[in-house]
Amino acid sequence: MAQAQYAGTGRRKNAVARVRLVPGTGKITINKKDVEEYIPHADLRLVINQPFAVTSTQGSYDVFVNVVGGGYAGQSGAIRHGISRALLEVDPDFRDSLKRAGLLTRDARMVERKKPGLKKARKASQFSKR
């Protein structure tokens, strides 16, 4: 018989993460690399594990992630979002705790575009009155 798999898609900034949860030992694999190898920052690894901490399911599922776009922070946020959505498939009762922790909400903040005539999105050259 096939093993149960739960899928979820997460997005953050320019990153898109496709997440699969399989009952297992808690091993996280991102783009066929171990999480410690793929994401060098410990605080971002904590971000990825947040949904498991909130639902107290640490070590219950192996996580397989395919993530594209963005940098470390965006990808970590996308993975967290994807794991949260996949955990909803596992048990719909998790919705309350995940929603309260704000893990089901897609973070809509994006980089503001650079405007013509300015140096950056908002940085202008110094204004001279005279």
Swiss-Prot record:
BP GO annotations: translation
InterPro entries hit by this protein: Ribosomal_Su5_D2-typ_SF, Ribosomal_uS9, Ribosomal_uS9_bac/plastid, Ribosomal_uS9_CS, Ribsml_uS5_D2-typ_fold_subgr
UniProt cross-references to Gene3D superfamilies, sorted A to Z: 3.30.230.10
Keyword Cell inner membrane: no
Coiled coil ranges: none
Xref: Pfam families: Ribosomal_S9
GO molecular function: RNA binding; structural constituent of ribosome
GO cellular component: a single term: cytosolic small ribosomal subunit
Entry-linked PROSITE patterns: RIBOSOMAL_S9
Keyword annotations: Ribonucleoprotein, Ribosomal protein
Family label: Belongs to the universal ribosomal protein uS9 family.
PANTHER family on file: RIBOSOMAL PROTEIN S9, SMALL RIBOSOMAL SUBUNIT PROTEIN US9M
Protein name: Small ribosomal subunit protein uS9
UniProt source species: Streptococcus agalactiae serotype V (strain ATCC BAA-611 / 2603 V/R)
Lineage: Bacteria, Bacillati, Bacillota, Bacilli, Lactobacillales
